[in-house]
Amino acid sequence: MRMRSLSAASSGYNGDPRGLGLERLKTVVRGKLRPSGSEIEWLWPSDQNNTASPAGAKTDQPTSAPRFFLTREATVFGPSWKPASRQIVASVLPVTGEMVMVSAERFSCMALFAVFLKLYRGFYMKPVAPCATHVRRPIMLAQFPVFDSRPSHGPQEQSGSHEPLARAAAQRRTKHNFLFMPGFPCLACVPISASAERHDRAMAACRAASLTEHLWPAYGIRALHMLNRTPAAASITRAVARRSRLLTADLTRSLETFPAGTITCAAGAPMIFSDCRLARLDFSAFYPCLYAAYVGKHRGLTKILHERLRRRAGSEDLKPALVTMFGGLRHVDANGYRFVVGASNIIAKAVEQTANRMGFGVAAYVKDGFWGAFDSSSKTTAEELRAECEKAANATLARLVVDKDGAGEPPVSLVLRLEGVYTDGLLINANKYWLFNSESGDSFICGVMGGHERSGLSRETTAAADDILKKIKASAKSIDDVEAIARSRIDAWIYAIFGHRGDVEFWAEQTPGDKDFLIPEEIRTTTVGKLEAADSCLGGELSYVFIPKNTQDTGAAKTKGGGARGWHSAPAAAFPCSLVEDVFCIKINYEAHLLPRLEGLLAWSRIYAWLQFRNQIPLADDEDESTTQAKETARIDYNYGDVSFLFA
């Protein structure tokens, strides 16, 4: 991982946290930093007289602090952006603590930074005694974005009729906050909601930090790999030889068909399922378990996987670490990544064959999970299906990794979970479907635009799509009924999100990486300079909101047609939220966020309506089915112009 200077010293940065964002922005503008390149940023501290000083300045050894100790001195050479020099460095570490618990309702990342700054000044900016032992003043280092200071609300604080969705979203928002700097205590800051989680949440965070040995998330994709203690040289040789044997010809061939994992969809999609037995199943920590089987003895990873698979209290905190490990596996262990994906393909084939023998047809298989329907004559229960498919998966994995002499048994067994049983469904493609249990009211929807994001807008949109499909199933008798249902629910969706105007957190989306970033003229100052060149550096990593490019004309212009597609907002650009929270106040281009989601809601409604009622509509002699479908479902529309004034 590369490191770049934030050039705070050269600009006279005096350690005031309120200027941190501006100094970072200046460095991005000058082209000295690319946040999307996984770089670590270095801040040169200043002395108490506001005069910037290099990292080579000497200070006294902090012997007066009983709760901290000074590490042994080390010699390093650097930095990389100027002529290298030899430097002696040391760090202060806490004696009794490694985590900080803070109030989720009142936590501020700037307050945490101020605490670290006070520690830093106390240890390293004291006057130098004439006979004191000197050490080099350490640099300050931070990786951005570091903080997620949004509160994690408990389930009882959520309102509305979609409590499971709201509760899941609230759980995803709970996150660790790290500010790690040489010379600072490297503390994990865990937000605790006193009203909802209390002691259990704190203990879960401590348990997760202990299992990862405080390496996550500070070391990102390499954190869990670092838990693997280096064996003796002879053991390394044997391990390399064993792993090379695991990349068999069959496994390699499977990568030619599915290089990123098995993704299949039933022929004939889109289609609907009515009054039948459906089941959705998913492997827990699937890819990390396969990697554990590949590497063999990896006690740190094995311990974490056992904790996660047993669903112990607080194990949810380990999921981001496991997901990140596999997300970057191709960059850390390319052969291990090839084995994991190839093994998952072979296991998927074995699982589907087992399911077919039990009278279960797979509608969609996506990497580590699948769903489908039982034959009407099948007597197999969903639990029996789960158990047999899990057994087949473990037997297949054992054949892939166990040697002829019986060595190499997987350290953890694969666990297949039954996520839900349903009676009705809509399949559009492998990544876009809806499942519903008419008896219990449970549902699951996948593929709604932004449905995987944490923002309030995405949660509201997912709930709206789910509601529309449920109401169509329950009461629609014709396409005209679908039109009325969609219009009514979209009205409710519009007015629900109306109350969140100006809330950057509610509207934030994940950065697409290839959007047109253009920061408006009103925040281009002589201090910051022109920002166009820096826009692309902010793509791909951060969350963003859309803003108008032309701030003089932010209204929408109506064109012929009048529907959702008949409105064109002023040109919009994505703007990184990290620059909004503490530095700028901007005007959000609401239409740029709303219109794609509105089209998505209409598309779900149109597809379901056509599949449900197409047998009632005769085809004209001069039309094919697609033409008739487009004509008949066009009436399911929504004129955004009628409500655009709400977001003007």
From Swiss-Prot:
Compartment(s): Host nucleus
| Region Disordered, residue ranges | 43-63
Q: Which GO terms describe its cellular component?
A: host cell nucleus
What is one GO biological process annotated to this record? DNA replication
Q: Does the keyword Secreted apply?
A: no
Q: Which UniProt keywords apply?
A: DNA replication, Host nucleus
The protein's superkingdom reads Viruses
Q: Which InterPro entries match?
A: HSV_HEPA
Family under the similarity heading: Belongs to the herpesviridae HEPA family.
How is the subunit organization of this protein annotated in UniProt? Associates with the primase and the helicase to form the helicase-primase complex. Interacts with the origin-binding protein. Interacts with the polymerase catalytic subunit.
HAMAP family from the entry?
A: HSV_HEPA (MF_04010)
Relate the protein's function as given in its record.
Component of the helicase/primase complex. Unwinds the DNA at the replication forks and generates single-stranded DNA for both leading and lagging strand synthesis. The primase synthesizes short RNA primers on the lagging strand that the polymerase presumably elongates using dNTPs. The primase-associated factor has no known catalytic activity in the complex and may serve to facilitate the formation of the replisome by directly interacting with the origin-binding protein and the polymerase.
What protein is this chain from?
DNA helicase/primase complex-associated protein
Gene, per the UniProt record: UL8
